[in-house]
Amino acid sequence: MLKAGLKSIASYIPEKILSNADLEKIVDTTDEWITRRTGIKERRIASENENSSDLGTKAALKAIERANLKPEDIDAILVATLSPDYFTMPSTACKIASNLGLVNISAFDISAACSGFIYLLEQAKALVESGLKKNVLIVGAEKTSSIMDYNDRSICILFGDGAGAGVVSLDNENHILDVHTASNGNYGDLLMTQRSQKSSLCQTLSMQMKGNEVFKIAVNTLSNDVVEILAKNNILAQEIDLFIPHQANLRIIKAVQEKLNLSDEKCVITVQKYGNTSAASIPMAMNDAYEEGRLKKGNLILLDAFGGGFTWGSALLKFGGENF
């Protein structure tokens, strides 16, 4: 029986660069401190007239083309974002569908913060393998700058904008072997997007995070999660060809990498140039690996992510072909 596979991957990177040196002029921080604590050197910022749906549409068009499909071949669009175009509706997925000229298809958003792309893979795999859908477009798109308080030096240094997309279809070469997702809402107040005026719908939104607590829980949770998904599938860590984690913080990535005893050659790291792009970070990093020639036929790929909610997840993919 054919299994669901990720047939393509693509990304869109905004042109504007916001470097650590630039942030030194905005808040009380230094390049040395940011680099030492996070590994981030710069991040990308979308233009004022670009929304998450615009970023996502540009990545989506590339992903559809790389899958050797046309927009009209897509029968579902799933989007993960914590920075949607609109507060409640319409969904960013519906906006992307409109941008692609598509109607009468399933289109909805998933709210799983930085774990969003793992959740998308799980849902797309289920839709395709059940026979409900044939070609599911999954998009992680973030304009985090739209909800960022650039007076808060503890958080504005971390995030950037961007988008990544892929197409999930039945495939005899590229397989989504397994996906695991989980959550614990008891920690929701440690990382959230807060309303400025709870009594009014006319309010601004800003992200807030208790970084030290999030860091500790993220490292422990991710370390355990990747060990569990490998054990469940009878796979040894040394069999992993490429580890592509959510790009939140270099210290978190390195902690999980060390837990798995993986070499630097097997670990894809892009946080230094993009910052934390939330739901977009994994597909953006995967696209970089593809364009750099690091994705090889037959590769076994491990993904993992942790985000607000708390949510987390991991996935095992087999890259079997040359499609993307």
From Swiss-Prot:
Region (ACP-binding), start-end ranges: 247-251
Active-site residues, Swiss-Prot/TrEMBL: C114, H246, N276
Catalytic activity, as annotated: malonyl-[ACP] + acetyl-CoA + H(+) = 3-oxobutanoyl-[ACP] + CO2 + CoA
GO molecular function, one term: beta-ketoacyl-acyl-carrier-protein synthase III activity
InterPro entries: ACP_syn_III_C (IPR013747), ACP_syn_III_N (IPR013751), FabH (IPR004655), Thiolase-like (IPR016039)
Domains: entry comment: The last Arg residue of the ACP-binding site is essential for the weak association between ACP/AcpP and FabH.
Subunit structure: Homodimer.
HAMAP family: FabH
Family according to the record: Belongs to the thiolase-like superfamily. FabH family.
Protein known as: Beta-ketoacyl-[acyl-carrier-protein] synthase III
Species the sequence originates in: Campylobacter jejuni (strain RM1221)
Protein's gene: fabH
